[in-house]
Amino acid sequence: MYAIIKTGGKQYRVQEGDIIDVELLNTDPGAQVEFGEVLFAFDGAKTQIGKPGIPNFLVYGEVVGTVKGEKVTSLKYKPSHNQCRKWGHRQHYTRVKITGIGSKRKGKEGNHGS
């Protein structure tokens, strides 16, 4: 089974056991997270398409830690003034391991892990 989730303004195709890097979340390593905005789900026989999201459907994950992305450098140069400025940036990401995909039921976690 796989699903397409939206978090941090980006979309990710995930299945159980995947490790993904998402925009920085304010959580500690080892914390459980739920992604509620599931846009698409496929379990091999049944396809669910959200409009825009699938109601009562969640993707569960566990925070592994925070990582930094690749360094992006920029350069600004003004030849007539003999002026040059160089700077760089490394974006912080949260690494999440997907632990389950399933529906959410009242009072229960749903079929978490299946």
UniProtKB/Swiss-Prot annotation:
BP-aspect Gene Ontology terms: translation
Entry keyword annotation includes Ribosomal protein: yes
One Pfam family per UniProt: Ribosomal_L21p
Disulfide pairings: none
Stretches of the chain forming a coiled coil according to its record: none
GO molecular function: rRNA binding; structural constituent of ribosome
Quaternary assembly: Part of the 50S ribosomal subunit. Contacts protein L20.
Function comment: This protein binds to 23S rRNA in the presence of protein L20.
PANTHER family on file: 50S RIBOSOMAL PROTEIN L21, LARGE RIBOSOMAL SUBUNIT PROTEIN BL21M
Protein name, entry field: Large ribosomal subunit protein bL21
Organism: Protochlamydia amoebophila (strain UWE25)
